A protein has these predicted regions:
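A conserved beta-strand-loop-helix scaffold within acyl/acetyltransferase catalytic domains
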Residues: 2-48, 52-65, 116-261
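Active-site/acyl-donor-binding loops of N-acyltransferases
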Residues: 9, 56-63, 125-150, 281-335
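Conserved acyl-donor/pantetheine-binding loop and adjacent beta-alpha core of acyl/acetyltransferases
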Residues: 58-79
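Short, flexible active-site-proximal loops enriched in glycine and acidic residues
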Residues: 66-69, 107-110, 133-135
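A gly/proline- and charged-residue-enriched helix-loop-helix capping module
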Residues: 73-117, 122
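Aromatic (often tryptophan-rich) hydrophobic motifs at membrane interfaces
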Residues: 83-87, 91-102, 208-324
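Short catalytic-loop micro-motif centered on adjacent basic/acidic residues
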Residues: 111-114, 174, 287-290
Length: 335
């Protein structure tokens, strides 16, 4: 099979591509491209002009421990999207994974992370072949039946009481519509976001790009793929969440609220509740909470979201470190 591997570094160079996976879409490429500290790469494999596979990765600047030196990581949300028979997927993914590894090395990334696997065994042989190591992880997922009463029945009694009291005490739910609301939302979330939930928090431009993408017809049906929810009290944004929609699943990417100063409005609870009801109304089968931690230790955010009636599912993430000695050590520890 004579195949062609193509790399796209700029959104203006990306042609129209097939596929419905938002995590490997041109729309998400544009969002990353417009966010400071992010360098996206979109890979495609084609044969005789027909696209067989594609994958989107992004290099993020995550921390600065040493002055004038940036720590970078390369992240892929899944193993890509394929338009070929199942028996061709593994060799195609192996070719893309080799290119991703080389790209991360050129950009001096400290670690490569592949997460959101469709199944724990996805890409197993290719990861092993390219010296990646697995770490057991957890995911929390709510399942919908299409009935809003079913969502309420799955809640804990304390959650039902909190939602009822929040509405009674003046909490209002909606979606971000203006640039001022986007800015207020992102600043609120950054101030109140726990490092235990997610170590990387994007620049404000990330949320601005999402909002522009929702309104921009030039990047396809992105209005169906992203949504920013906000919780208000007396016209002030006190909470909110960001959802990304792909296939039959809604993914809660970010959520948070000003819980200490607005105890009676339960902003974090309302931010999640709004995402759940919207996903159900859209006809999604699942809502998955991203970044709920590993099974090795307690995780406050995981305990928080489990009270919305979701179930824990075992999965794994694959990593590769820049330092060979550290990567070899992890291969021994996690193999």
């Amino acid at each position: 099979m004579a195949i062609k591997l193509t790399s796209y570094y700029r959104g203006s160079h990306v042609p129209e591509l097939p596929g419905v996976d938002t995590f490997h879409s041109t729309a998400l490429f544009h969002i990353f491209e417009g966010t400071p500290g992010c360098n996206p790469l979109l890979l495609t494999i084609s044969e005789n002009g027909t696209v067989l596979a594609k994958i989107l990765v992004v290099v993020q600047r995550i921390a600065r421990f040493i002055p004038f030196y940036n720590i970078r990581r390369c992240v892929s949300y899944g193993t890509g999207e394929y338009f070929c028979p199942d028996d061709q997927r593994e060799p195609l993914f192996n070719e893309m994974l080799k290119e991703i590894t080389n790209y991360a090395r050129r950009l001096n990334c400290f670690v490569i992370e592949v997460r959101n696997l469709p199944s724990p065994l996805s890409g197993f042989a290719s990861f092993r072949r390219n010296s990646y190591f697995p770490v057991n992880w957890l995911r929390v997922r709510n399942t919908f039946t299409g009935d809003e009463k079913g969502i309420e029945q799955s809640l804990s009694q304390s959650r039902k009481r909190q939602i009822k009291n929040a509405i009674k005490n003046g909490a209002e739910m909606g979606t971000a519509q203006t640039e001022a609301e986007i800015k207020a939302f992102s600043l609120m979330l950054k101030r109140n976001y726990l490092s235990k939930i997610r170590k990387h928090f994007p620049a404000i431009e990330f949320f601005e790009q999402i909002q522009r993408g929702i309104k921009d017809v030039h990047i396809g049906d992105s209005w169906q793929r992203f949504k920013i929810f906000i919780v208000k009290y007396q016209e002030r944004i006190i909470g909110g969440s960001v959802c990304i929609y792909s296939g039959d699943t809604a993914y809660l990417w970010f959520s948070g609220g000003m819980n200490k100063t607005h105890l009676r409005q339960y902003p974090s609870v309302m931010a999640v509740w709004q995402a759940l009801t919207d996903a159900n109304n859209r006809g999604c089968k699942y809502l998955e909470f991203m970044d709920v931690g590993t099974p090795f230790r307690k995780h406050g955010y995981r305990d928080f979201v489990l009270r919305f009636g979701g179930e824990q599912i075992s999965t794994r993430r694959w990593f590769k470190f820049k330092w060979k000695w550290l990567n070899r050590l992890c291969l021994l520890l996690y193999s």
